[in-house]
């Protein structure tokens, strides 16, 4: 419908209402007019939108050494694992930039399997890699997955988490990273194929095969089970990097048997056995994973295998104090906001590390131990103006004495130890 000014009979812009005399140009369309000013405004809006949604690509992929250096800022130890991950991730995104083919040579996808004990840094490494590359990242727990049609989560729900992490920008999600934890829990119950249905073990491995390799998956936007009458989000998993991690308890005896070392036997060199046992996981081969219960096709889609070592006492002490996000630094900053200086004695840090080793929780257990120690401190000190410094001693960690509190004049505040009723 043409818009005219009733008084002068002039044409008007259908968007802003300005007349032909008020603008430089008026462009006619079927039933509408648009002025040059509105065209310019629309162009700016479209360019801004396209700028946000332009093809997601990595112009400057950090080199493996650069990736390793950034990982060092957040993750203590695990040097071999960092090196393997840095190379694998660099090659993966270089492959994406090249379009998967260079001079008719097809570059295959390199998903990663991380094997290491609880609390050794598997999840943190994957999270930090995603942060370095600024790509969407999602964590999934393999234990909640079941084969399609059974109670539990479908494997497509993993992809939904990644899409949500990318704010439903599917193109960005298609170049993200998914970390699947507890992957060892979906091993089949025995090395031999089962004649009965294993819906949470081998069945899940079979269901994961396609998305690991690369496929166009249909994902329900609201999650949950699929049904025929709902809409789906289509996502190509070809360029999604999958990192699978697990503790793989029971894998070491399998490696020992392959290497010809007896698990139990007379005349064995016990000292040599202890030395070898520390590095057994680093000698893992695909055939060991097959014996553990992963199916051949699944192992074949995880070509990069890297192992993490159990963290020793010194590594745990370093984790408490050295990374940018170290737990001790966080508590020091929190108390600094209340005008109190927090100090942990070296022996106190070592005692915390020993407790984590005893609990066999690795780095993951450090926070819960420190939170237990710091609860009363964080409760009391914000209300006290006479405290300038708080020192956590080894006796505090052991539960024998309260922390040492120092006044502004440097004198120690005498405290009575709280006894449990």
Swiss-Prot record:
Domain ClpX-type ZB: from-to ranges: 1-54
Family matches, as SMART domains: AAA, ClpB_D2-small, zf-C4_ClpX
Keyword flag Kinase: no
Residues engaged in binding Zn(2+): 13, 16, 35, 38
Keywords from the named record: ATP-binding, Chaperone, Metal-binding, Nucleotide-binding, Zinc
Oligomer status and interactors: Component of the ClpX-ClpP complex. Forms a hexameric ring that, in the presence of ATP, binds to fourteen ClpP subunits assembled into a disk-like structure with a central cavity, resembling the structure of eukaryotic proteasomes.
Reported function: ATP-dependent specificity component of the Clp protease. It directs the protease to specific substrates. Can perform chaperone functions in the absence of ClpP.
Xref: HAMAP family: ClpX
Protein name (record): ATP-dependent Clp protease ATP-binding subunit ClpX
Gene coding for it: clpX
């Amino acid at each position: 419908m043409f818009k005219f000014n009733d008084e002068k009979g002039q044409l008007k812009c259908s968007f802003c209402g300005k007349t032909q005399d008020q603008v430089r140009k008026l462009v006619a369309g079927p039933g509408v007019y648009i002025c040059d000013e509105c065209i310019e405004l629309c162009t700016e809006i479209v360019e801004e939108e396209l700028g946000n949604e332009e093809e997601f690509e990595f112009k400057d992929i950090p080199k493996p050494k650069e990736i390793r250096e950034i990982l060092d800022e957040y993750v203590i130890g695990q040097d071999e694992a960092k090196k393997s991950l840095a190379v694998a991730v660099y090659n993966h995104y270089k492959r994406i930039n090249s379009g998967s083919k260079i001079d008719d040579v097809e570059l295959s996808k390199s998903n990663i399997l991380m094997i290491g004990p609880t609390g050794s840094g598997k999840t943190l490494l994957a999270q930090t890699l995603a942060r370095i590359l600024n790509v969407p990242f999602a964590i999934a727990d393999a234990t909640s997955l079941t084969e399609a049609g059974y109670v539990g989560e479908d494997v497509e729900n993993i992809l939904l988490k990644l899409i949500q992490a990318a704010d439903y920008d599917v193109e960005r999600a298609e170049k993200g990273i998914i970390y699947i934890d507890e992957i060892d829990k979906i091993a089949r119950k025995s090395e031999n194929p089962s004649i009965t249905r294993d819906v949470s073990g081998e069945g899940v491995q079979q269901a994961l095969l396609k998305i690991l390799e690369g496929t166009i998956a249909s994902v329900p936007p609201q999650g949950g089970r699929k049904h025929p009458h709902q809409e789906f989000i289509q996502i190509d998993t070809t360029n999604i990097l999958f990192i699978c991690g697990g503790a793989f308890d029971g894998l070491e005896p399998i490696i020992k048997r392959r290497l010809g070392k007896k698990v139990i036997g007379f005349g064995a060199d016990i000292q040599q056995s202890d030395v070898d046992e520390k590095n057994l996981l680093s000698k893992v081969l695909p055939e060991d994973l097959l014996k553990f219960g992963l199916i051949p096709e699944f192992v074949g889609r995880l070509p990069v295998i890297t192992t993490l070592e159990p963290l020793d006492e010194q590594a745990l002490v370093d984790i408490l104090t050295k990374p940018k996000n170290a737990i001790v630094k966080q508590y020091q900053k929190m108390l600094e906001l209340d005008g109190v200086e927090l100090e942990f004695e070296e022996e106190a840090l070592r005692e915390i590390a020993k407790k984590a080793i005893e609990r066999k929780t690795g780095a993951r257990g450090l926070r819960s131990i420190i939170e237990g120690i710091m609860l009363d401190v964080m409760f009391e000190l914000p209300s006290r103006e006479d405290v300038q410094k708080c020192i956590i001693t080894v006796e505090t960690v052991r539960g024998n004495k309260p922390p040492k509190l120092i006044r502004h004049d440097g004198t120690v505040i005498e405290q009575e130890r709280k006894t449990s009723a």
